[in-house]
Amino acid sequence: MNNIKITIQYDGTDFYGWQIQPNLRTVQGEIYKAVQKVYGEKITIYGCGRTDAGVHALGQVANFRVPKMLVPINKVHIALNSYLDRDLRIIKAEEMPDSFNARASATFREYLYIVHNSSTSFPFYERYAWFYRKNVIDEKLINEYARYLIGEHNFTSFCSTEDENDSKFRYLERVKAIRKGDTIYFIIRGNAFLHNMVRIIVGTLVEGQKKKKPINFIEDILKSEDRAKAFVTAPAHGLYFRRAFFKDE
């Protein structure tokens, strides 16, 4: 079997998330149909991260296996894109060892969250950033709060109550807010994420600085292991799966 890794970008606005669902348009489902048309095979697609409805991707990664390389590897992305709509694109394809699995082989996943912090919203931000005008966001204070998220913690307080993972422990390597003009970019990198985890982290950091919470308030929320202690879930449309990191990379 030939193991093919693909890097994917998509505008998540008109998708019901990554994972295949009956009678719904999903990213995994659309790629599956394109692979079937190119290779004539029923295959399994393994994705690095499961994005929710409305969430975008700049560098999502997936892999699938096919018995024959009917298309040269440098043309695979072109062949697949011919069966995909314009809001979903395969950026590149690579042949990988059989041991590679986009989900299991990833050591870290990195998300980007964009907040437009202005008194006026702009049409081109509507689908791609959280418009926040309640106050001028203090990114320096946010970065002080964020220090308490680094490392391994029980993130029960920072995930949906519908999350089905047995363990809520996750490791975060980086949580950083960077301001460029009226736009704030949150970069959050971890080994894995719980349902709505990034969006709840961003919403809690933003609302925390608005309320002028003490520096260690994040620590108290983590210790509570109670979703009700954290703040709002930031909107899906500001979130992007930015990239994945793999072993030996």
UniProtKB/Swiss-Prot annotation:
Its EC number is 5.4.99.12. GO terms for molecular function: RNA binding; tRNA pseudouridine(38-40) synthase activity. It is an enzyme of class 5 (isomerase). Coiled coil: none annotated. Substrate binds at Y111. It catalyses: uridine(38/39/40) in tRNA = pseudouridine(38/39/40) in tRNA. It comes from the Bacteria. CDD domains: PseudoU_synth_EcTruA (cd02570). The active site is at D52 (nucleophile). Keywords: Isomerase, tRNA processing. GO terms for biological process: tRNA pseudouridine synthesis. Belongs to the tRNA pseudouridine synthase TruA family. HAMAP family: TruA. NCBIfam families: hisT_truA (TIGR00071). Homodimer. Formation of pseudouridine at positions 38, 39 and 40 in the anticodon stem and loop of transfer RNAs. This is tRNA pseudouridine synthase A.
